[in-house]
């Protein structure tokens, strides 16, 4: 048994169906778009944390 009761053979079959439907070039595009979206999200979260700490530094005591 694999993850959540899905066997490795079932996962391979699902992967083969996805590749057959979309093709490898479309999957590469989807993968790179998803990676860039995650990178931009992390960058936005880091800049938000930086802005929050800068605001806290400027508060009078």
Swiss-Prot record:
Lipid bilayer topology: Single-pass membrane protein
UniProtKB keywords: Cell inner membrane, Cell membrane, Membrane, Protein transport, Translocation, Transmembrane, Transmembrane helix, Transport
Gene3D superfamilies recorded: 1.20.5.3310
One annotated Gene Ontology cellular component of this protein: TAT protein transport complex
Oligomeric form and interacting partners: The Tat system comprises two distinct complexes: a TatABC complex, containing multiple copies of TatA, TatB and TatC subunits, and a separate TatA complex, containing only TatA subunits. Substrates initially bind to the TatABC complex, which probably triggers association of the separate TatA complex to form the active translocon.
Domain of life of the organism encoding this protein: Bacteria
Protein name stated in the entry: Sec-independent protein translocase protein TatA
Keyword Cell membrane recorded: yes
GO biological process, alphabetically ordered: protein transport by the Tat complex
GO MF assignments: protein transmembrane transporter activity
Protein species of origin: Legionella pneumophila (strain Lens)
Function comment: Part of the twin-arginine translocation (Tat) system that transports large folded proteins containing a characteristic twin-arginine motif in their signal peptide across membranes. TatA could form the protein-conducting channel of the Tat system.
Pfam families: TatA_B_E
Membrane-spanning segments: 2-22
Presence of keyword RNA-binding: no
Annotated HAMAP family: TatA_E (MF_00236)
Recorded family membership: Belongs to the TatA/E family.
InterPro entries noted in UniProt: TatA/B/E (IPR003369), TatA/E (IPR006312)
């Amino acid at each position: 048994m694999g993850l959540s009761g899905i066997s490795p053979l079932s996962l391979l079959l699902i992967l083969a169906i996805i590749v057959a439907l979309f093709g490898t070039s479309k999957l590469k595009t989807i993968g790179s778009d998803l990676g860039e979206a995650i990178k931009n999200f992390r960058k936005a979260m880091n800049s938000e944390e930086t802005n929050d700490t800068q605001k806290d530094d400027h508060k009078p005591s």
